[in-house]
Amino acid sequence: MTTLTLPRRPFIEFSGVRFRLWPVVLAAVLMQAVLWPARELARWIAHQQAGFFNGHVWAFVGLAMVFQTLAGLACIAVMRRVLPAAPTYLRWPSRGQGLIGPGLAIGVAMAATMLVADWWPQLLAHRAPDGGYDTSPAGVAGWLIVMASSGLCEETIFRGLLVGMLTVLVPGRVRVGRFDIPFSGLVVAVLFGLAHYTSFRVDPLWMAIAQQLYAFVFGLVYVWLMERSRSLVAPMIAHGVGDALEVAAVMVLQVAWAVR
């Protein structure tokens, strides 16, 4: 008897990809058009009210995020008219399919990854990371609320808007082992990493490179959570929990190792 064996699937596989450069350039331009003006508007307001914002940097960050979220939602509203087939996942997940637990667990793992990647020299030397965070009660509350809200802002823009748009304009899928996401998610993960380019100007080179790498990987995970749950809620939770817990850990170390 002859036994037929199916050919092994390659470990990395691209399927149905129709790559076109102009949608990727459009996504990069749209990313900056959403992020930069909103941030500069918040900066202008902060300059006008310098007496308050100089002592409450978290409020400036939060204000910029509010403006960026509103800009992202406005672009999604336009996209729904221009590209009605584009998925935005701006919905509550179906009951039992929200991946809330995995989102929380992934957020904790991401916080640990960022803490080590960003601050490993200080951690090894038992020297407090100088994150510059205000550790007064109001400062702690402000920073944690703002960081926990980062997922609402960035997932709306990067996964809801940009992945949704490119899913239609650059269709296809990419699979690595059992990890399977739309090709648009891979493209936007690259853009998500590039959005952190300012770290090359203000941080040591090793830290900037680490931030690029983990931002790219996190971007892939956020897309996976979004597609599996059919909602932005799980990636928003993972993103916000990761950012908030890393900042909380840095604040604890600032106090424990006597940096004010």
Residue spans of the language-model regions?
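Juxtamembrane "helix-exit" motif on the non-cytosolic side of transmembrane helices
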Residues: 38-49, 117-124, 197-203
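Residue-level signature of transmembrane alpha-helical cores of multipass secondary-active transporters
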Residues: 28, 103, 107, 143, ...
